């Protein structure tokens, strides 16, 4: 007697990223995978595997806690002080809005991390903050640094990306952008944040401020 196979799921429409797994060697969301796409002929085999860069909880279900920890490292949120009215936000050009909207589509699925040769399984939680942070967190740091309110934490994010496991640990394999289900320009974000950390380091050296 066998028990049902366990996997994670949520939205069933490719917006939450919970069901991400490796299907016939390719990392993707299982909810949008059609049988006919991978097994068009009778007798074809479909192989399902859990992502290899995260600890397996059971069967196809993995623990993505390290992925979310990386978002905490770069403070991927907009700081809000509710003690006073901030008023209306500044106007943005349609081009800037579109850039940020594209970056905001990240669903923290882990595809980019699974494909990245620099990102490896690390089950020791004490080492997470010194391991490569990953393309998703770098891109989200860019998103919030370009937000008029979010950029209040810009210096903190750049400091984190300048530290061990930050943007300089990227090997430029560009696998991340090839597997991203939302086609987010991850390599552009990595390049942009690499330049930003360099400018930040030079400015900090001369001003003494971080």
How should each PLM-predicted stretch be described?
Residues 1-4, 35, 46-210:
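Ferredoxin-type iron-sulfur electron-transfer modules in oxidoreductases and energy-metabolism complexes
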Residues 5-11:
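Ubiquitin-like/PB1-type beta-grasp interaction modules and other compact soluble beta-rich domains
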Residues 19:
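Conserved phosphate-handling catalytic cores of large alpha/beta enzymes
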Residues 12-16:
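FAD-binding core of FAD-dependent oxidoreductases
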Residues 23-25:
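Short strand-turn-strand beta-turns centered on an Asx-Gly dipeptide
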Residues 39-45:
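Extracellular interaction modules
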Residues 31-38:
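A short, sequence-level motif marking secondary-structure junctions
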């Amino acid at each position: 007697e066998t028990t049902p196979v366990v996997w994670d799921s949520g939205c069933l429409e490719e917006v939450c990223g919970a069901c991400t797994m490796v299907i016939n060697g390719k990392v993707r969301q299982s909810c949008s995978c059609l049988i006919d796409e991978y097994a068009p002929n009778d007798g074809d085999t479909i192989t399902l595997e859990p992502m290899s860069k995260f600890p397996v909880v059971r069967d196809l279900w993995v623990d993505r806690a390290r992925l979310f920890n990386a978002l905490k490292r770069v403070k991927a949120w907009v700081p809000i002080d509710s003690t006073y009215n901030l008023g209306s936000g500044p106007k943005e050009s349609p081009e800037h809005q579109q850039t940020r909207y594209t970056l905001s589509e990240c669903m923290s699925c882990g595809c980019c991390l699974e494909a990245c040769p620099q990102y490896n399984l690390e089950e020791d939680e004490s080492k997470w903050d010194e391991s490569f942070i990953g393309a998703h967190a770098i891109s989200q740091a860019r998103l919030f640094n370009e937000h008029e309110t979010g950029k209040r934490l810009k210096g903190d994010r750049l400091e984190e990306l300048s530290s061990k496991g930050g943007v300089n640990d990227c090997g430029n394999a560009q696998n991340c952008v090839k597997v991203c289900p939302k086609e987010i320009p991850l390599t552009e974000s990595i390049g942009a944040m690499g330049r930003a950390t360099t400018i930040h380091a030079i400015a900090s050296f001369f001003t003494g401020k971080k």
